[in-house]
């Protein structure tokens, strides 16, 4: 491993810090250190050790980084949260992962190797907590389920905790509906994309069809139907005012913007990269009843109203959707995605999940999918899920994130989920960062459209 060290002051204690491992008690008297290095895999890592270490190290897993994008190591969600945690005495570590994209097979070992590197340099922590955001929530949960001996607890924030198979199935459903209802004769390929160039071509064609459809009442109704199949909320951008509950037009406009984003990146470009790793198409909709799925969506009322306003028959469109040729998966690709990226729900240490209610990228119903897995896996008592009343993906305040960490720590210390109600989390958030928002609320998400886990009855492809 290679290392590059920067310390705040060049003192004898800093020299000792570089020269030998030490215990948490020794670390409390040392100078703060910032360590950057690389792992044998090629991943970069980042470590921040505070001057007065409290003995806890936080292993942070970052979100999805597309192929071709910069991929620096990260050890916290944002700078403000990082600084407050360092001020409170936490050591912060994290890696870049060796590759970009759907990199779970690199991410998990790279994160554990980063923890090993930390221990070699600074000595064993009194306690290790794993935490992560977005795709990093998937990585964190994978560590929690498969490497529980390495951590005392875990925190998933806006996490992709429905797992990989369910994620890609639910990414397929809205674009399948868009093609069937807006461009049935277009020849747009939804899976088996082959190359980045093919994916980009299909994404552009679909985005064009959606953009054109948004100009008519009929098109807007059909876009709302596609959004409902993915449970895209009608308020998903925190920079915009929250629409009134029955402001269907404003809600649909927000869903349209989110769907365009889904088409431009996850549904085609990111899918193609994941298919390459999986060795084929890992998604299917054989046997899927979209009428039933829409009936379970919290956005059914909006779809019904917009269809009525457009003078369209929802029943007729659902029949057309039911007749559209279905897509079958490659069993080997499903097996790869299931083995690497799907959960059992079997926890042995406590995990806290937090999620915003207005998340369009990983809709809040992902939490229902993991609750289902935890129930089947027999670990419901170890899981708590709490919700923040805000639009957007991972749009937590600094206080809300630190409140979640402190709540998890209490569970690790006491064996009980004490002070974990929304009102308690809000109090913790205000205490941690008085100027930041505290928006936890009592909330129960709807069911996930198509869950898939490794502990429930067979969820696999049919047909």
Predicted feature locations:
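Secretory targeting and sorting signals
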Residues: 1-29
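C-terminal His-loop and adjacent cap/lid subdomain of alpha/beta-hydrolase
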Residues: 30-463
């Amino acid at each position: 491993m290679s290392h590059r060290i920067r310390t705040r002051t060049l003192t004898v204690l800093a020299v000792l810090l570089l020269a030998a491992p030490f215990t948490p008690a020794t670390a409390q008297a040392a100078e703060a250190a910032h360590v950057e290095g690389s792992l044998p895999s090629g991943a970069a890592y980042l470590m921040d050790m505070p001057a007065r270490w409290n003995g806890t190290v936080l292993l942070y897993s970052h979100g999805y980084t597309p192929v071709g994008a910069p991929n620096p190591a990260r050890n916290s969600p944002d700078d403000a949260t990082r600084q407050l945690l360092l001020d409170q005495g936490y050591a912060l570590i994290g890696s870049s992962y060796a590759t970009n994209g759907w990199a779970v097979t690199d991410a998990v070992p790279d994160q554990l190797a980063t923890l090993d590197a930390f221990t070699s340099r600074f000595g064993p922590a009194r306690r290790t907590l794993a935490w992560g955001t977005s795709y990093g929530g998937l990585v964190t949960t994978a560590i929690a389920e498969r490497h529980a001996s390495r951590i005392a607890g875990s925190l998933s924030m806006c996490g992709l905790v429905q797992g990989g198979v369910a994620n890609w199935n639910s990414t397929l459903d809205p674009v399948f509906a868009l093609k069937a209802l807006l461009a049935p004769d277009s020849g747009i390929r939804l899976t088996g994309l082959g190359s980045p160039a093919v994916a980009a071509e299909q994404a552009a064609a679909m985005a064009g069809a959606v953009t054109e459809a948004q100009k008519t009442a009929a098109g807007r109704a059909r876009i709302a139907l596609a959004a409902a199949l993915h449970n895209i909320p009608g308020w998903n951008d925190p920079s915009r005012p929250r629409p009134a509950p029955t402001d269907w037009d404003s809600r649909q406009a927000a869903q349209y913007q989110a769907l365009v984003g889904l088409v431009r990146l996850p549904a085609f470009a990111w899918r193609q990269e994941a298919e390459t790793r999986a060795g084929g198409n890992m998604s299917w909709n054989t046997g899927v009843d979209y009428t039933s799925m829409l009936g379970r969506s919290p956005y059914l009322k909006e779809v019904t109203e917009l269809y009525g306003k457009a003078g369209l028959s929802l029943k007729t469109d659902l029949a057309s959707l039911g007749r559209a040729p279905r897509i079958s998966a490659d069993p080997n690709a499903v097996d790869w995605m299931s083995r690497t990226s799907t959960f059992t729900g079997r926890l042995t240490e406590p995990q806290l999940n937090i999620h915003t209610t207005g998340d369009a990228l990983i809709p809040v119903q992902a939490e229902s999918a993991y609750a289902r897995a935890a129930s089947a896996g027999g670990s419901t008592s170890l899981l708590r899920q709490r919700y923040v009343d805000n639009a957007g993906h991972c749009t937590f305040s600094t206080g809300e994130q630190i409140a979640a960490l402190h709540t998890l720590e209490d569970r690790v210390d006491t064996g009980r989920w004490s002070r974990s109600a929304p009102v308690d989390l809000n109090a913790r958030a205000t205490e941690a960062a008085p100027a930041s928002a505290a928006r936890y609320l009592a909330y129960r998400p709807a069911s996930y459209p198509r869950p898939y886990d490794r502990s429930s009855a067979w969820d696999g492809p049919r047909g």
